[in-house]
């Protein structure tokens, strides 16, 4: 997707070795850098779908803040490529809480908007939960015809179904497991 978006020969990757939490994945699960789009420089960031389908993992919010800070300092647009499976649930406590955590990028988007710096999102694929929120906070949204976003309800649960779509049997099974755990 970067090859289609960025003018040839202008991509300059950033933070490719940045892994402050020393994740077993060896990454913060985002790809970011500077590049020209139609002749204009932009800061570009996207979820790395080769790792956990682009899920939020520890260290990712800090990397995102580095990128949003760069867009603010350079006064150039921030462009997102959004295809995110949500969060790596077993480690969510490591990146949800705190002043520089996963909620901060959304605040930063608002700051950029206030400063007149465009925040754009190219949305593709299935984006439940955290991926969905990431896709709705930018100023301008451009979605692929097959893209979807789910920030709550059945869309989240059906997004977890390997069969795709709304899965009534899967929902009933999840409800039964939840009740069983609650009764223990």
List each language-model region with its residue ranges:
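Intrinsically disordered, low-complexity segments enriched in small/flexible residues
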Residues: 1-42, 48-53
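A generic alpha-helix structural signal
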Residues: 2-6, 61, 68, 109
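A generic fold-level signal
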Residues: 25-27, 37, 73, 114, ...
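A structural preference for short, pocket-lining loop segments at secondary-structure junctions
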Residues: 31-48, 62-91
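A generic structural signal for short coil/turn motifs at secondary-structure boundaries
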Residues: 52-56, 89-90
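Short alpha-helix boundary/capping segments
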Residues: 55-63
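Conserved catalytic cores of soluble enzyme domains
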Residues: 82-184
